[in-house]
Amino acid sequence: MSHTVKIYDTCIGCTQCVRACPTDVLEMVPWDGCKAGQIASSPRTEDCVGCKRCETACPTDFLSIRVYLGAETTRSMGLAY
């Protein structure tokens, strides 16, 4: 089943989500939008198993990373209406 991994610009570049991912879906890439100078990226979403460990690991008040599971993707992102 296909999942969507969305990373928001509230990412603080802490790498917690990258370290929490058991399937190495995430990696850090250079970004000037935060003090850390990097942001999470999801180049391998086809390997996402939907465990949402990345969401749990995210320390920001508004989760900077969200995993939308298969059919819930369009509904959760507000695209189904």
Curated annotation (Swiss-Prot):
GO terms for biological process: photosynthetic electron transport in photosystem I. Residues 1-31, 37-68 form the 4Fe-4S ferredoxin-type domain. The lineage of its organism: Bacteria, Bacillati, Cyanobacteriota, Cyanophyceae, Acaryochloridales. InterPro entries: 4Fe4S_Fe-S-bd, 4Fe4S_Fe_S_CS, PSI_iron-sulfur_center, PSI_PsaC. It is a peripheral membrane protein. GO terms for molecular function: 4 iron, 4 sulfur cluster binding; electron transfer activity; metal ion binding; oxidoreductase activity. Apoprotein for the two 4Fe-4S centers FA and FB of photosystem I (PSI); essential for photochemical activity. FB is the terminal electron acceptor of PSI, donating electrons to ferredoxin. The C-terminus interacts with PsaA/B/D and helps assemble the protein into the PSI complex. Required for binding of PsaD and PsaE to PSI. PSI is a plastocyanin/cytochrome c6-ferredoxin oxidoreductase, converting photonic excitation into a charge separation, which transfers an electron from the donor P700 chlorophyll pair to the spectroscopically characterized acceptors A0, A1, FX, FA and FB in turn. It catalyses: reduced [plastocyanin] + hnu + oxidized [2Fe-2S]-[ferredoxin] = oxidized [plastocyanin] + reduced [2Fe-2S]-[ferredoxin]. This is Photosystem I iron-sulfur center. Keywords: 4Fe-4S, Electron transport, Iron, Iron-sulfur, Membrane, Metal-binding, Oxidoreductase, Photosynthesis, Photosystem I, Repeat, Thylakoid, Transport. GO terms for cellular component: photosystem I; plasma membrane-derived thylakoid membrane. It is found in: Cellular thylakoid membrane. [4Fe-4S] cluster 2 binds at C21, C48, C51, C54.
